[in-house]
Amino acid sequence: LYGCRGIYLPLQTDAWGISTPEACGWAVWIGAAPWIARHLWDHWRYSGDREYLKEAYPFFAGVAEFYEDYLVRDQTGTYQILPSQSPENFIPGLGEFPVLLGKSSAMDVQLCYDALGYAIGAAEALEVDADRAALWKTLREHLPPFVIGSDGRLLEWDRELPEGEPGHRHLSHLYGLYPSD
């Protein structure tokens, strides 16, 4: 999907096994695979089971491979996530329709950062794929930084924008604090 290699998991599936994005916005969220990778990584981290890590490594590598193709390098050398979405939130658009997709939402960047880190850590622990791990490190080092707003808070999007729903119940942009490390 999206013309990318690697592993992408949709947000949803239905009773018929259809898992393609059916709506703009929440259905095109790309964060499910890195979120699942977090659970696999936690299992490895707390168990230390190398056999488990060998089985989980293809998943970590597959998620990282998806980002190899999905990230877009901009004129400054930063790898942007385009399109990007912040779950169930929006940016007030021009006219009557909200904008559901943007560039490098905080949550997408944080999930990508973690997923690349899991792939790097697993490759190093298993002493495999040094070249791929080097690429993943480069991508990770050139992701966009967190953006702090004029009022001192971590912003949900790549720049200060009007909020579609101030006080929205999802604090997706805080993923980097929890459950991430």
Each PLM stretch: what is its role?
Residues 1, 18, 24-46, 50, ...:
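Active-site core of glycosidic bond-cleaving carbohydrate-active enzymes
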Residues 1-8:
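Carboxylate/His-rich catalytic cores and anion/metal-binding grooves
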Residues 6, 78, 176:
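A residue-level signal for beta-strand positions that form part of recognition/binding surfaces
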Residues 9-28, 84-104, 160:
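Acidic/His metal-coordination segments adjacent to aromatic residues that form catalytic metal sites
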Residues 13, 34, 38-40, 83-85:
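Short, small-residue-rich loop/turn micro-motifs
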Residues 62-122:
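Acidic/histidine-rich catalytic neighborhood
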